[in-house]
């Protein structure tokens, strides 16, 4: 697979995560997910994640931590995915692609986790990234600036 799937769990200063809603044609359904997209050859995974966060949400982050790498569906494709945790956010104007109609919301991290548990967030990279961050929180693996922000 030529692109590498990337996702970002952006955490703001109040412990909210930014989610993106959009219609996904392959499933003929609306989907809530973390900001994500494809990283083309020639750019690093981190550069692609930074670009997607900026384009979809108008957000840049000072700090980044890779939290999960995965095979997205190894019985059907060789596409790989990587997700990052991003914090120390700055906000600007979103720059979605012409064919993207996105709805961007902020919810407490715990609410995003509940949406995963209820099956409202179904995208595999989003589910894996949110659950990984929750596990890091439960196991005391979050970096100091995030410990008080991410509540599970």
Put a short name on every predicted segment.
Residues 10, 19, 85-86, 106:
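Conserved hydrophobic "DFG−1" position in protein kinase catalytic cores
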Residues 1-2, 7-51, 55:
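Conserved Nudix-box catalytic region and its N-terminal flanking loop in Nudix hydrolases
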Residues 34-66, 84, 96-98, 108:
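The catalytic Nudix box helix
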Residues 30, 75-76, 82, 99-152:
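Nudix hydrolase/Nudix homology domain
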Residues 12, 24, 54, 58-92:
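Active-site segment of metal-dependent pyrophosphate-handling enzymes
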């Amino acid at each position: 697979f030529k692109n590498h799937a990337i996702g970002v769990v952006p955490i703001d200063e109040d412990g909210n995560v930014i989610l993106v809603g959009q219609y996904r044609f392959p499933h003929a359904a609306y989907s809530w997910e973390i900001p994500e997209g494809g990283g083309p050859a020639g750019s690093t995974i981190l550069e692609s994640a930074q670009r997607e966060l900026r384009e979809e949400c108008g957000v840049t982050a000072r700090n980044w931590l890779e939290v999960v790498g995965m095979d997205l569906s190894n019985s059907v494709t060789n596409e790989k995915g990587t997700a990052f945790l991003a914090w120390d956010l700055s906000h600007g104007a979103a720059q979605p692609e012409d064919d993207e109609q996105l709805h961007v919301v902020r919810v407490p991290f715990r609410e995003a986790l509940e949406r995963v548990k209820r099956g409202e967030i179904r995208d595999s990279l989003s589910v894996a990234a949110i659950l990984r961050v929750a596990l890091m929180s439960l196991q005391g693996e979050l970096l100091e600036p995030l410990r008080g922000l991410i509540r599970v």
